[in-house]
């Protein structure tokens, strides 16, 4: 890594810090948010107390009725839960709804989807890829009866009703003669989207007259599906979309919770490559989202949502929801918005973490189309990444060439810079030395900063690719050379023993592509520092920092996707080849002659150069005064 690259990274860091600093909330906003959270917490606490009372009451009823005769039990349940008493007793059974890509199991207890498997995918150890099962999920609506009893649908037994449509099933909760609550699930062929409709019939005297919404509780554990637990956990997030607005998410790195006062279009429980999304046409209101990080075990995070969904007590209109159980594949998620107005678009493709701002734009309109186009003809993704790297290098060639020419100019002027250093030795003549060097560069038509701008312009593509490769589900379970899966690390050596500091940050393995990337970066750094030595004095520690960066990348990327480290390895190799070609094809004698000719031409100073020289003169005067003050002492 050369000095220009390091400066580019530092500039990006400064921009990110400045953006965060100027967009931080004001004290007034923080105080308003605190008051809002306090009020929500009080309401939530009261609701939890009431819910706990109802749960305790239900548990006591079940315990006291367990040994009673069926007739007596039915009578007692009728007294405690009214028309819902009969639905409190039953035997759990399951109805399967499936197509070629998804298998779902719907339990008659709660009338909910309790199992979801993606047929076209497996886990990292070749087991069926199950998003969740009955023990890892909960989906419940709280019902308030006309007699002010609180009943949970998760405690009630529904009756499956099969209609004429083989792709649909109705889970019916009977509440009396001509009165029932229907949950209808419809799964079309080859579709990951499940239509979910809630419709009540004759519930006017069953539910409370004020009922115009149902309170939802949705919980799910996110399983580990990939080989690298720590790396996968970085991409496990609870996402949500505002109505006709942007997509946001809770913290990826720690437990998090948030109350959302605005209506939400959808809520998504996202793993690294797969998601479970609940969508509402009318929107979710009074939503509370909770994400709990699990440090060890097969579960990465536990997600929880409480929200309110509209419900028509008169039964004239159904509540229309949808589930998405499927992969985080950009083209697939984008297809759900085809032919849909901008206000109604789901924006599910934003579940794929492609970066923000210009980086996402580069991925969406350049990287992904190029990747998909090459994928139509090349099925070996190692070869595809190689060709993609070459294409990117060709596109960036003009910027790379300009950067190298700037370095070449600095290099051929090095003897003259060394003469200036000899003429103005010591720290006390630093300003004279700097001024003379800048005058030399200005007269010759060279600029130390001209090599930084091309490198900075390349950064959006380089960072976009850094975001793209770990998120590309196409690389999942795709092998190349010794790497069995390009979506995770390619360990050539591993161990089981926990080693303090090393295991948490480096892992219990060594990734070969990451190691090769580090070696090539160290070689390129050494070679490039020799080639770009301008004779000027470097900042203290700069050389050590240049060598430390590749070693830091070894630690940082060791647990990353091998597809990404393979790309960086190939990219650095191509850069080395380009540098060698530039080195031996550019005639430095002719270049020096051209620069000497520039020095003889009258040059009009730019406004920037004038301001730079004025600043240098001011610094020189300040330094002179400081030195005189020291002599007087």
UniProtKB/Swiss-Prot annotation:
Keywords: Cell inner membrane, Cell membrane, Chaperone, Membrane, Protein transport, Transmembrane, Transmembrane helix, Transport
GO cellular component term, pick one: plasma membrane
Entry keyword annotation includes Isomerase: no
Molecular functions (GO terms): membrane insertase activity
Record's signal peptide: none
Family of the protein in this entry: Belongs to the OXA1/ALB3/YidC family. Type 1 subfamily.
Protein function: Required for the insertion and/or proper folding and/or complex formation of integral membrane proteins into the membrane. Involved in integration of membrane proteins that insert both dependently and independently of the Sec translocase complex, as well as at least some lipoproteins. Aids folding of multispanning membrane proteins.
Subunit structure, interactors included: Interacts with the Sec translocase complex via SecD. Specifically interacts with transmembrane segments of nascent integral membrane proteins during membrane integration.
Name of this chain's protein: Membrane protein insertase YidC
Species of provenance: Parabacteroides distasonis (strain ATCC 8503 / DSM 20701 / CIP 104284 / JCM 5825 / NCTC 11152)
